[in-house]
Structures are given as structure tokens and as C-alpha cells.
Amino acid sequence: MLNLDSKNIRFLARMGARGTLGQVVYDYLKDERDLYVVTADLMHASGFDRVKKDFPERLVNVGIAEQNLIGVSAGLARYGSPVIATSWAMFTSVRVADQVRNYMGYMQSNVKLIGMDSGFIQSEFSYSHTNPPDIAIMRTIPGIKILSPCDGTEIYKAVVSAIEYKGPVYIRLTGDTLMPIVYKDATYNYEIGKANILKKGNEIAIIATGNIVKNGLDAADLLKDQLDCTVIDMHTIVPLDATLLQELKHYKLIVTVEEHLKAGGLGSAIAEYYAAEAVKPRHIILGVDDIYTPSGTTGYVQEQVGLSSRQIAERIIKEFRS
């Protein structure tokens, strides 16, 4: 496997989410580990060119047939090998929800479904491909872990952890090439279900997931002379880190940030958790309202829906002082 030193951390950041996926899958197979790879006509986009060249017997391309992607992957997994399955996040959630529910969730198949280009990264292709409600859909299917890594280093660790976990996993990949680096030191511990505290404060907790974790960090930096913020990378949405959420109960304000609809996403999951608690913090959810997001670059769409670092900081100040 790749040595995640400072040089390779920068390398993964330059490759982006899809390139990192291809790298970790290739490294896993190169180490002679057991794995099958299935894709829905996205071999190149998934970074699997070297996999096809060096391990053709381990790669299946089902074509533009996402429902079949899930069925074939679940079938392969029945023979005992873990399976990586890839397509665009809009299609791995909305289009195949029936198959995911039956063949992954109910059957507990050892399939790791990768939703590529989740969030706003495909906004230039219009709404048919962008801002999929993937967290919301996957949260309604019992028995599936949901991972949402924030940078190249964490994608690498998350994919390895998912492969080695026996059972169905959904990984949503957000961000493009030249991803911002959140983890400059890869020696940190990545554990499914265990969130990471990136910055420690005692007044406000910013909880983010996916590539927008960097916006949360930058917002906290903008506020450093006014408010004391904790910043948390909630890389696992199912299961949530309940231990950490208990520790945050006495914070003055919790702010969840996500490139996802407010309905059914990370903020909803955390609100549902606190609904059963007698003592709970004030909580605001920053995400996409009940709208169709516009076309444009990721930065443009973030600005339009209030998720730039500056807008996050401004909203926190407004809520904290109200």
C-alpha cells in the first residue's frame, strides 16, 4: 500500500477523489489482496485504467446499467470476495435504491458502493448529475455504513477500512482534482464510526462532512478572534459517533455543514440523535434548502446556497448573537 508521507499526501490531493480511488484500489490488488471491482461504464473516470491493464480478471464493466451494477456486485460478493462498485453518486443512490435495499442492505452483501462526484462537483452538468440526496436515501436502508471522507488521505484510509469491513458500505466522494489538504499528517487514526476533532474549542462546534470540512476549518479561522470553535470531521454518518455527540451536549451552539439537502443529511441525523436527549445544544443545519441547485462551479454553487467559508462564519456570528 502507499506510504502516506507528506509527498504522497500532496500526490493524492493533486489526483483528487477519483484518482485517489483508483490508486488505493490498484495498491490493494497489487499487494495480492482479494478484491473484485465492478463499474458502470466509468472505468477511466474511476481511475481504473491500471487495474484493467494489470488485473483484468478482477474488473467487470457492466456498461451504463447501474441496476445491474448492484446485482452483479452482490452476486460476486456471494463467492466470498469483497467488491468495489462505482458510478456517479446520483445514480448509485436515486437510480438504484431498490437494488441497494434488496441486494446490499437486506442480503448484507460485502459490497462497497462508491458514489463518485457527490455534492456540487458536477454542477456544470446541470441538476441531473449534481447534489444527489445520497445520504438521505442510504440512511433509510438498514444495515449500510455510510462514509464521507474529506480529502485524499482520508479517502485512501476510508476505502481500505471499507474493504476490510465485512458488510455493505456506501462511500460518497466529494471534491475535484487539487483537493484541499485537511490531514497534513497521515498518522492519525481512521476508524469507522469515530469522528475526528480537527480543532478544539469550547463554545461552538462546527461538524462537517466531505470536502466541505475545509470550509468549516476556514470559517473557524475567520472567527478565531471572536469565537472559540471546535471543528469536527464527521467522516462516518452511519453510525454516528454517539460518544462525541454526548460530549458536545453542553456547547452553546452546534453547526452542521454539508453539500447535501438539509432534509435527510448529516444535520438531520444529528438532530434525530439529540431529539431523544433531555439536555441538548442549540443546533443549526447549513446545507441545501428545498431547491434545485443552480449550474456552475463548486465555489459558485456554495456561494448561492450559503456554504462558502465566509458565509458559514457570518451565519455563526448571527446565530450566536441572536
Question: What is each of the regions a protein language model found here?
Answer:
Residues 1-172, 177, 189, 304, ...:
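Thiamine diphosphate
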